[in-house]
């Protein structure tokens, strides 16, 4: 309990404020929730009562912005870097298999937005290296999805969202 309180107290003020609002307004309807704080490039997993369970660095869309273009039939590699945005918003999310059968947290199916374990990507992207740095400044590299450490996804996201939907705030 003390470690969880310490984690929340060390979270950015905006994360603490949104957590208090979610609980006081019951916006999550008692469901677990996950917050992605874009400025700090971190994800925070909470249970339905607002207890902070886990925190991890994340990778986000290569471009800054809050609105994402809905993908069309073009391959992801055809999306220009300046359009690779992790959008801001609130969504009901659930675990589901991706096209390759791997479990992901589907945030917005229509926009192909999900939170998933870090992918290797192109060698020049050095996704694992970017996630390992202490600064969030280099954590913008994805096509828009949120990439999380494998252990964070397996030990926090997957069990918390198993068998139930939850809310994602970005």
Name each model-derived stretch.
Residues 1-34, 55, 63-69:
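Extracellular/luminal recognition modules and glycoprotein regions
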Residues 12-16, 21-24, 36-38, 70-73, ...:
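A short linear-motif detector with a strong N-terminal bias
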Residues 20, 41, 154-155:
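Solvent-exposed, polar/charged alpha-helical surfaces in well-ordered, non-transmembrane soluble domains
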Residues 84-170:
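Exported/periplasmic cell-wall-interacting domains
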């Amino acid at each position: 309990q003390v470690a969880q309180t310490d984690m929340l107290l060390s979270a950015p003020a905006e994360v603490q404020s949104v957590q208090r609002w979610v609980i006081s307004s019951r916006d999550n309807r008692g469901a677990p929730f996950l917050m992605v704080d874009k400025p700090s490039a971190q994800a925070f997993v909470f249970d339905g009562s607002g207890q902070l369970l886990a925190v991890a660095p994340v990778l986000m869309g290569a471009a800054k912005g809050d609105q994402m273009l809905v993908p069309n039939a073009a391959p992801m590699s055809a999306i220009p870097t300046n359009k690779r945005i992790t959008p801001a918003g609130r969504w009901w999310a659930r675990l589901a298999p991706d096209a390759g059968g791997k479990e992901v947290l589907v945030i917005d199916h229509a926009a192909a937005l999900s939170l998933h374990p870090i992918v290797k990507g192109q060698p020049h992207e050095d996704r694992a290296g970017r996630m390992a740095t202490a600064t969030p400044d280099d954590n913008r590299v994805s096509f828009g999805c949120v990439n999380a450490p494998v252990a964070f996804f397996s030990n926090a996201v997957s069990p918390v969202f198993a068998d139930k939907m939850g809310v994602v705030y970005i």
